[in-house]
């Protein structure tokens, strides 16, 4: 059975994995998921990630990050969904928790944070909020 929203599945696996204090979570890989994982790593929300290819299928493993026994990611939520896409222009990209969190945005120049999108001067689809 095909998944209707693989990105929401990725975010849910991360959220559930941190709730039960797992060291890592794995999921089917895609270019967008790898790009989101790279942004999460660059921003310090996850320790690391790796893509393991097995023939035609590839798997994305994400090493979750904790600080003082608590998950680093307090909140991670999907914004743009298959039934309701959310696009924002370069001047309308939202801030998460007044700049303490990040919004992950898919732009014509790739997947990036809200701060980088504003600095680059591009808008795009708001994928999720992370705090």
From Swiss-Prot:
Belongs to the universal ribosomal protein uS8 family. Gene3D superfamilies: 3.30.1370.30, 3.30.1490.10. One of its GO terms (cellular component) is ribonucleoprotein complex. Part of the 30S ribosomal subunit. Contacts proteins S5 and S12. This is Small ribosomal subunit protein uS8. One of its GO terms (biological process) is translation. It comes from the Bacteria. PANTHER family: 40S RIBOSOMAL PROTEIN S15A (PTHR11758). InterPro entries: Ribosomal_uS8 (IPR000630), Ribosomal_uS8_CS (IPR047863), Ribosomal_uS8_sf (IPR035987). GO terms for molecular function: rRNA binding; structural constituent of ribosome.
């Amino acid at each position: 059975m095909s998944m209707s929203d693989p990105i929401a599945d990725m975010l849910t696996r991360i959220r559930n994995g941190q709730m039960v204090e797992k060291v890592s979570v794995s999921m089917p890989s895609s270019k967008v998921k790898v790009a989101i994982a790279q942004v999460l790593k660059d921003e310090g929300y996850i320790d690391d990630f790796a893509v393991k290819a097995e023939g035609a299928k590839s798997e994305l493993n994400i090493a979750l990050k904790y600080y003082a026994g608590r998950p680093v990611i307090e909140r991670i939520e999907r914004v743009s969904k298959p039934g309701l896409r959310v696009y924002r222009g370069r001047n309308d990209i939202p801030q998460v928790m007044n700049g303490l969190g990040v919004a992950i945005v898919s732009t014509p120049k790739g997947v990036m944070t809200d701060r980088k999108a504003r600095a680059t001067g591009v808008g795009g689809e708001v994928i999720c909020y992370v705090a």
